[in-house]
Swiss-Prot record:
Keyword Nucleotide-binding included in the entry's annotation: yes
GO biological process, one term: asparaginyl-tRNA aminoacylation
Catalytic activities: tRNA(Asn) + L-asparagine + ATP = L-asparaginyl-tRNA(Asn) + AMP + diphosphate + H(+)
Record lineage: Bacteria, Pseudomonadati, Bacteroidota, Bacteroidia, Bacteroidales
Record text on subunit structure and interactions: Homodimer.
EC number(s) per entry: 6.1.1.22
InterPro entries per UniProt: Aa-tRNA-synt_II, aa-tRNA-synth_II, aa-tRNA-synth_II/BPL/LPL, Asn-tRNA-ligase, Asp/Asn-tRNA-synth_IIb, NA-bd_OB-fold, NA-bd_OB_tRNA
Source organism: Bacteroides fragilis (strain ATCC 25285 / DSM 2151 / CCUG 4856 / JCM 11019 / LMG 10263 / NCTC 9343 / Onslow / VPI 2553 / EN-2)
Name of the protein described by the UniProt record: Asparagine--tRNA ligase
GO MF assignments: asparagine-tRNA ligase activity; ATP binding; nucleic acid binding
Gene Ontology CC: one annotated term: cytoplasm
Length: 467
């Protein structure tokens, strides 16, 4: 086979030098035709679009042609030709074909449609489908957008540890990390495990958040962001929860709650605009195939300012809805941690646009959030989105050493684990704020997928760690 430099299909579709010899490589999506001519839809993953390879059967070995089945991998040399078919600009008239990899007839991704549940069971193959090819290209582009946004605003990308001895959220739902023999654990007189001989000499876990370390960096570098995997040992089998997911967490010195809300709104709008501008084909495919209102919803986020509403006012709106006959599964009262149905009512039914809810009761929020003067609420903020509910959670951080100490004691957090965090309040404390965006929740919104397990390549959930 003549050696010709490969052209990606995404680039091939932009070329207009018809008559040129080209090489394309990819996997067969479909093959159809007559006894004289076959049409092969070839895809290499660079785009949602296939290139049509036109094969004059008389010019090729019959035994080789038998190997060209759905899923087979081909290298094709041919003439780039202007297509007469609708929906495609160019096609390739095959001159040489090499089968790089045959595909066994047990290949599960045949031309028929497959359920999302079935595709989760073959997560090692599902990126080859149109749907997951689109989702994972969008995932890549969203990661690029995140780095680009913060770089352009002068933030520093800061790497925080995955193994930690602190629990940022105080929930205790952490995966432990140990090298100890689980069948011969050393225990003290009270029956508690002794970690002195463990690898780190203390109890260690996988991180639930890089926020605390991010705060340390912000008080030195001014503005930082983290972007990495986080882990929650929360036994939740829902379409919104994963045990392993990715978080983006900016922290900014001297920002108070208003600047924090401004940053969150600007950031998420930037990401949505990036998806519409740079993933147009993939977004359109998902809009047409899965969620007819996807593009309209994405564009709607960009058109108006987000509503900014105190938690107390949000509760009043929900209580009024109940009084008028609206049924919620979970009760509404001041002090409740809002359920997704409450959040979505505010966004989808009442305001019909994203909402930033602020000033939550301190009893339902984390220890590090700055307390308001009323003594009952903290300067927390949650960004609520249609179809998703909470997509961002953040706050102005408590900068007062004594107030932070008191809150840590109230929540029974071991002081020995927090000395380094408290040091930042002893040595040149400053106002600072930040938030966390669950990457997969952003992807749920941008792709229109309904289950968070379908926007991450290999989902980790209770009793599921395959691949």
């Amino acid at each position: 086979m003549e050696k010709i430099s490969r052209t990606k299909i995404v680039d091939l579709m932009k070329r207009e030098d018809f008559g040129a010899m080209v090489n394309v490589k990819g996997w067969v999506r479909t093959r159809r035709g007559s006894k004289q001519v076959n049409f092969i839809a070839l895809n290499d993953g660079s785009t949602i679009n296939n290139v049509q390879v036109v094969v004059d059967l008389a010019n090729f070995d019959e035994e080789m042609l038998k190997q060209i089945t759905t899923g087979a991998c081909l290298s094709v040399n041919g003439v780039l030709t202007e297509s007469v078919g609708a929906g495609q600009k160019a096609e390739v008239q095959a001159r040489e074909i090499e089968v790089l990899g045959t595909c066994d007839n047990t290949y599960p991704l045949q031309k028929k449609g497959h359920s999302m549940e079935f595709l989760r069971e073959i997560a090692h193959l599902r990126p080859r489908t149109n749907t997951f090819g689109a989702v994972f290209r969008i995932r890549h582009n969203m990661a690029i957008a995140i780095h680009k946004f913060f770089h352009e605003k002068g933030f520093f990308y800061f790497h925080t540890p995955i193994i930690t001895a602190s629990d940022c959220e105080g929930a205790g739902q952490m995966f432990q990390v140990t090298t100890m023999n689980l069948y011969d654990l050393k225990k003290d007189a009270n029956g508690s495990i002794v970690y002195d001989d463990d690898f780190f000499g203390k109890q260690a876990s996988l991180t639930v958040s890089g926020q605390l370390e991010g705060e340390l960096a912000a008080t030195a570098l001014g503005a930082i962001y983290t972007f990495g995997p986080t882990f929650r040992a929360e036994n939740s089998n829902t379409p919104r929860h994963l045990a392993e997911f990715w978080m983006i967490e900016p922290e900014v010195a001297f920002n108070e709650i208003q600047e924090n809300m401004d940053l969150a709104e600007e950031f998420i709008k930037y990401c949505v605009r990036w998806a519409l501008d740079n993933c147009a084909d993939d977004v359109k495919f998902l809009n047409d195939m899965f969620d007819k209102g996807l593009i309209e919803r994405l564009e709607g986020v960009l058109k108006e300012d987000f509503v900014r509403l105190p938690y107390t006012e949000g509760i009043k709106i929900l209580e009024e809805a109940v009084a008028k006959g609206h049924k919620f599964e979970f009760p509404v009262y001041w002090g409740v941690d809002l359920a997704s149905e409450h959040e979505r009512y505010l966004v989808e039914d009442h305001f019909k646009r994203p909402v930033i809810l602020t000033d939550y009761p301190k009893e339902i929020k984390a220890f590090y959030m700055k307390q308001n003067e009323d003594g009952k609420t903290v300067r927390a903020m949650d960004v609520l989105f249609p179809k998703i509910g909470e997509i961002i959670g953040g706050s102005e951080r408590e900068s007062d050493y004594n107030k932070l100490m008191t809150r840590i004691e109230e929540m029974h957090i071991p002081m020995k684990d927090m000395w380094w965090y408290l040091d930042t309040r002893k040595f040149g404390t400053c106002p600072h704020s930040g938030f966390g965006l669950g990457f997969e929740r952003l992807l749920l919104f941008v792709t229109g997928m309904s289950n968070i397990r379908d926007v991450i390549p290999f989902p980790r959930t209770p009793r599921n760690a395959d691949f």
